[in-house]
Amino acid sequence: LTEISVVFILSIKLKQITVSGAIILRKNPETSRPEIFATQRGYGDFKGGWEIPGGKLEPGETPQKCIVREIREELATEVKADKVIGVVDYDYPTFHLTMHCILCTIVSGDLKLLEHEAAKWLNKETLRSVDWLPADLLILPEIEKLLISA
């Protein structure tokens, strides 16, 4: 690459996408072990990849309000946004993702899959058994801490 092309490449600004992701934590009803809810994308470039459920912030929306709305829309479930456990920044090839990862508890509903292909409850042993999307991989150490301390 020439110096000019390097400067040009570095000056290209990636599209910024800001999302909230729900870390829905529960105790397994049979084993009492802590586990989190993971979903498999059912559409788009990342179809088939696993993620914590969530979606894009709307203008003027807080990450907490966003995650409550997104889980209602995607999973027909009401959650309480408890606290942000981390913020992930990741550069995909065509956009920069900022993901607010929010610990959530279920208030009501049965987590119906309205947009996802599949879902699983994962514990500390099975957490890394699915093919996580690259940005979601970055929050796994924090999720592991939650699963150990819960």
Can you describe what each PLM-predicted range is?
Residues L1-I12:
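N-terminal amphipathic/basic-hydrophobic helices that include classical n-h-c signal peptides
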Residues S11-I36:
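Conserved N-terminal beta-strand and adjoining loop/helix that marks the start
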Residues I17, E78-K80, V87-D110, A118-K120, ...:
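Active-site-adjacent beta-strand/loop module that shapes the phosphate/pyrophosphate-binding cleft
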Residues I24-L25, A38, C104, W121:
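Conserved hydrophobic "DFG−1" position in protein kinase catalytic cores
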Residues R33-E73:
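Conserved Nudix-box catalytic region and its N-terminal flanking loop in Nudix hydrolases
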Residues P63-I71, V84, I102, A119:
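Hydrophobic packing within well-folded, soluble alpha/beta domains
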Residues L103, K112-I143:
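NUDIX/MutT-family hydrolases
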Residues E144-A150:
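Generic C-terminal helix-cap and adjacent flexible tail
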